[in-house]
C-alpha cells in the first residue's frame, strides 16, 4: 500500500451518522406467540406439580409445608404471569438491522443493548432450529465474527425463508469484499 492512498482525517462529532437513522426490523409475531406459549406451558407445569403435591393422598406433608403450599402456588402462578408479560415486552423490543456495511441486533427492556458487527468481519453464519422452531417455520441466525469462538450474536425467531435470505446476503457480501 502506498503512502498516497492512506488517509486518516479527523471527524467531528457533528459529522457522525445519527444512531436513530438505523431502522430495526422487529422479530416475527409467530416467534412472540411461540415464546409466550412455551413460558405459559412451563409455569402451568410448575403450578400443576405444586397442586398435585398439595392434593395427593399418598404421602403426608409436614404441617408447615401444608400451611404454606397454597401461598407458594399463588406466588408461582403470579410469577408465571409476570414473567410471561415481561417476555412479551422483551420479544417485542428485539430487532435486527442490516445496512450496507454492518449488521446490528437490539434487545432488552430495562437494560437495552445494541450489538453491531461489520459484515467484512463476519467469519460465518449458521442457521439453527429446534423441534418447536421447526414446527412453526422459525430459525435462529447466529453470526460469528472472525477470530471468535462463540457467536457475536444470535437473532431468534426469524421466518425460515427470511433467515436463508439474510444468510445468503451476508455470505455473498463477504465474498465480494474478499475479491476487492
Residue ranges and their predicted role:
Residues 1-120, 124-180:
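N-terminal basic, Ser/Thr-rich segments that initiate or prime the first beta/alpha elements at protein or domain
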